[in-house]
From Swiss-Prot:
Pathway: Protein modification; protein ubiquitination. This is Ubiquitin-activating enzyme E1 2. Pfam families: E1_4HB, E1_FCCH, E1_UFD, ThiF, UBA_E1_SCCH. Residues 16-36 are annotated as: Disordered. Expressed in leaves, flowers, roots and stems. Detected in germinating seeds, cotyledons, hypocotyls, vascular tissues, anthers, filaments, pollen, style, stigma, sepals, petals, ovary, developing ovules, funiculi and silique walls. PROSITE patterns: UBIQUITIN_ACTIVAT_1, UBIQUITIN_ACTIVAT_2. One of its GO terms (biological process) is protein ubiquitination. Its EC number is 6.2.1.45. One of its GO terms (molecular function) is ubiquitin-protein transferase activity. Keywords: ATP-binding, Ligase, Nucleotide-binding, Ubl conjugation pathway. SMART domains: UBA_e1_C. Disruption phenotype: No visible phenotype and no changes in disease susceptibility.
Amino acid sequence: MEPFVVKENIIASASSPMKKRRIDHTESADGSAINASNSSSIGLNNSIGGNDTVMSMAEFGNDNSNNQEIDEDLHSRQLAVYGRETMRKLFASNVLISGMQGLGVEIAKNIILAGVKSVTLHDENVVELWDLSSNFVFTEEDIGKNRALASVHKLQELNNAVAVSTLTGKLTKEQLSDFQVVVFVDISFEKATEIDDYCHSHQPPIAFIKADVRGLFGSLFCDFGPHFTVLDVDGEEPHSGIIASVSNENPGFVSCVDDERLEFEDGNLVVFSEVEGMTELNDGKPRKIKNVKPFSFTLEEDTSSYGQYMKGGIVTQVKQPKVLNFKPLREALKDPGDFLLSDFSKFDRPPLLHLAFQALDRFSSQAGRFPFAGSEEDAQKLVEIAVDINEGLGDARLEDVNSKLLRHLAFGSRAVLNPMAAMFGGIVGQEVVKACSGKFHPIFQFFYFDSVESLPKEPLDASEFRPQNSRYDAQISVFGSTLQKKLEDARVFVVGAGALGCEFLKNLALMGVSCGTQGKLTVTDDDVIEKSNLSRQFLFRDWNIGQAKSTVAATAAAGINSRLNIDALQNRVGPETENVFDDSFWENLTVVVNALDNVTARLYVDSRCVYFQKPLLESGTLGAKCNTQMVIPHLTENYGASRDPPEKQAPMCTVHSFPHNIDHCLTWARSEFEGLLEKTPAEVNAYLSDPVEYMKAMRTAGDAQARDTLGRVVECLEKEKCNSFQDCITWARLRFEDYFANRVKQLCYTFPEDAATSTGAPFWSAPKRFPRPLQFSSTDLSHINFVMAASILRAETFGIPTPEWAKTRAGLAEAVERVIVPDFEPKKDATIVTDEKATTLSTASVDDAAVIDELNAKLVRCRMSLQPEFRMKAIQFEKDDDTNYHMDMIAGLANMRARNYSVPEVDKLKAKFIAGRIIPAIATSTAMATGFVCLEMYKVLDGSHKVEDYRNTFANLALPLFSMAEPVPPKVVKHQDQSWTVWDRWVMRGNPTLRELLDWLKEKGLNAYSISCGSSLLYNSMFSRHKERMNRRVVDLARDVAGVELPAYRRHVDVVVACEDDNDADVDIPLVSVYFA
């Protein structure tokens, strides 16, 4: 999945938990009106009309069981966000979506991918050419077909575990009762209030959602009933702290270790556990806290009569459910309450849009259509209606009805734009999940959004909006034909074809980007499709597993729009592929869209975009959160200008000897797995393939690490070599004894429970936890499971087949009983690292060279006893295959270690999330992020927008929170009468000498004292011998001194120059490109 790096400068809300569609009226080809008002034609009748068609995909063999098991391989990334209980609730939920234009199909896509029980698609109208601007399942061949029927097959392909069916006639109240959630797109307020009244009063209430996209404007209303319980208001894990002390006073004061800052807030409820001395706190009762500081808080409780605190204790936040009392739409229209704000520069916008959408609804009711694009008469009529409604609001009347904004709404009101549909499709899809499960806080109750900044800056003539009998007519009706041509001729580079990449390709295809004769879209991704991708990367199907992501995604995108000129590559973007993505490639691009999943690649692409001065549209997701950053040449800072602080890493001694949470245990477990099963076998093979060169490298290194590596190789080929499966069981059983008994006994011997530090303080003070050795038992399932996984994997490294009996508890227990386990004798001179700053566990002072020679002699003897062709199999950790025993072993290692230290254990799925470093991901936040980005794409390709028109966004669908802000401008460096930013690059032509380059800089008032190329120094004023280079060409110095190999297409060399002004003050200057041809 695509993780983001949160940029602190775009977060405007202090409440942020992180630092850093439809067509109600269409036109024919000649522009005449075709009445399709309220295209879903919703009416609450007591019976179904004779024209109703009901079609279920169950007819095609879909058997959706009520007791469906969660497919953890498919939904692992989503499970990391929602958890099993939420997923089970989704699997039991039936959802209706009425209105299958662009917004409706986006909502359906997202909730089908999420995995509800069933989705029913409702629409009474037919596909028109106009719909192809925003609906990715429609093609030209679908024109004239019922929208729901034209959608069902492709939507069913997204998830065969969801029953997708259709309704094509008028809905009845009885039919609404079949659903837990109903979503209505493109419906009048009159009909919406009638439906919502029924849903609100139904027992149990039916969650009602009304959503609309009108050009660059969108609205959303939620009513989940009179009493809706939110079980998890923010989606975050309960925070906890390790107690250092508790006072006996009124009120009690609690301090925690300074290992990690507390994430509590005043008024939180917490529970205590494992407290020694003041045991009254261990009663499990939630307690309210106040005066929260980074490492302390006060209890709202008198602890003066409690026992005296001795040591230990964990304090954990208790998450409280929240009950929301939703108002029905009829009441909420008159008294909307507080609006959810999206853009803090538009603080007064939501009340105006609340009025505007009501005015638009009245216009549609009176005229039987929505306003025509470019019609000043219709726009003025809309303004008059808004003024009339506003006059009747009494005390709630707005001081100003923004006629300019209403004009924009009128002009685009008939269009469903794909970026708006994608964005709102993600938001509404998440509201459906909330309604089904109580997971995350719903929108309460209205949400309005607009992106009028995306419109072209120059006024457009009415002829710009005229339909062209094109699939882009809806988009043209908002932006005009001139910008549409720019979209079609754009040359775009999409880096990544995962979840974000799939959404981007879909969006760009529908927008017509790179679909013209001059346009081209290049997508690259070096990854292949896995099963876990299918729950978010919606362009892929199960029959694509194992195929290249970029190729499959490109083919699917071309299927959405056959005019898309797309080229799919399987290359990683980095310094090693600059022969593929060369100067000519970058220079010919219009814009770059990142869809990456790692910071290193993001920074490289950012550096290329800065170098070639190309716009970069950056985005990322993490669970329900997303952010976007616009990197625009000369207008904004670049992506690399700001960095998040590095994640805190646990000290090595903590992970290896003093773990105090399950993350430490899993970090250690994965390290041991890779050392035992991947690195050591690989080292064995390296030695056996070329013993002379291998030992030469070891002697050259000659350090403790080389010594330890050789020791493991000798151990693997000598006393721990396995020749039968029983040997593998013996190895696994002895590993258990070593890890979970002997090492702990040695640690307790070296540092007994009453040990003290050199200052006299208790050694085993928080956060350290005193461990207990485990006694192996063949009746303990977790013990046997560990031995099973370890022995099977050990056998795999030696090429030994696994007998079937070894996969049974009884058979394995019998074999384990035959293993002789030596008695443990503690070492009096054992050294255990306790320094948190230590980077290695090797502390003994020995003659490494002598030990390496001794180990080499042993290896020579081992090699003589082996068959010449003998090699081990190095096992690479693969988290997403539940049949390979990898996670069984890692979870077993971690949980047994957790048991040693009385740390709560976790199941295999949770272990997979942590040890596999799985990035939580859901389709809704991904879709929303790409919608935000593509709204910025209009601005980029228009080419005339200022920095204040662009928006960086941070959003968290769990809260929900939307925080949009103007990007930060680039840092400006000034020198004399000149100024420059990171976007500038100085160019010197004429194949200059070093002297000529220095004189050229001198003319700018700069004294260069150092010139480097790559990692080599071409010139330094302090080195007298460098003055001998004055008459040499800079390019020749680059070749001869820096060893630069210039490809045939390259006509310049880049040098970094360090300069001072005449006052000896350093001046940072841009990169200098010296052209030699």
